[in-house]
Amino acid sequence: MDPAVSPASTDPLDTHASGAGAAPIPVCPTPERYFYTSQCPDINHLRSLSILNRWLETELVFVGDEEDVSKLSEGELGFYRFLFAFLSAADDLVTENLGGLSGLFEQKDILHYYVEQECIEVVHSRVYNIIQLVLFHNNDQARRAYVARTINHPAIRVKVDWLEARVRECDSIPEKFILMILIEGVFFAASFAAIAYLRTNNLLRVTCQSNDLISRDEAVHTTASCYIYNNYLGGHAKPEAARVYRLFREAVDIEIGFIRSQAPTDSSILSPGALAAIENYVRFSADRLLGLIHMQPLYSAPAPDASFPLSLMSTDKHTNFFECRSTSYAGAVVNDL
């Protein structure tokens, strides 16, 4: 034995081990602390689904998209630059305001699931970096200057300010999960849909492909939050139904205002009809999320019709005709974003 290591410090289960910063082991820990056993089959299924559908930014080649950027009008280019500036920053928005929720749980299924979610969020961040550079013709200096100007745009600030205010007044763990559901399930919905409309013009095909993959990942993340809210917050009082409906209504109003305020006024990609369909989709998404947490719909919004570009994103193994690589998604989680 190395004389520099005391016998007490060699046993990670020794409750008498000492050392600066050492966390005491509970006197009567549950046996599951020391080995894996499945305790959350629904969350374990989502982890397995995430692993089965792992992907990397290196699998996507954006050369054709770089050529398509010149086909966008000035208003369209500005709009999509704005959306991707928001989406790129949104992961930090979630982490800064609602991070650490995984630390509330001892079930290894939940902890293991969050590891997978964090891994794929890294891929999303890297993909958004690539897409931003594509939209700026690989001019990183111009991209940086644009993001610095845009990150405090009123349309983005209203989302940030709303979230920060709701977090400050939030006094329960279940309500924080409602906020997480709304960020990933409502605050991204209009952006994902607007990006998907590029497909209808056969533009930025790989960007559309990555949007499909990211949207499907976020559908899994939102479903996981709903499952945790439903099944694994015992001992925590859930917010009253009126409070939940109020939060949903506020989030939907903000998201619809976000897309209305930024959409180009003269676009062959986003017609008035397309914008109306996106707004309906935001309401439909909210209703679906309410259903996942066993609540009645707020809007009774109809499902998007077959022409809606995100209709290709159900997880029934649809493959986009325009895509070089199939974005078929194994499993049965329905995209509700």
UniProtKB/Swiss-Prot annotation:
Catalytic residues (UniProt): Y128
GO cellular component assignments: host cell membrane; membrane
SUPFAM superfamilies reported in the protein's UniProt record: Ferritin-like (SSF47240)
Protein name according to UniProt: Ribonucleoside-diphosphate reductase small subunit
Organism classification: Viruses, Duplodnaviria, Heunggongvirae, Peploviricota, Herviviricetes
Family under the similarity heading: Belongs to the ribonucleoside diphosphate reductase small chain family.
Binding positions (Fe cation 2): E121, E184, E218, H221
Organism: Human herpesvirus 2 (strain HG52)
Chain positions covered by the region annotation Disordered: 1-22
Transmembrane regions listed in the UniProt entry: 177-197
Gene transcribed to yield this protein: RIR2
Cellular compartment(s): Host membrane
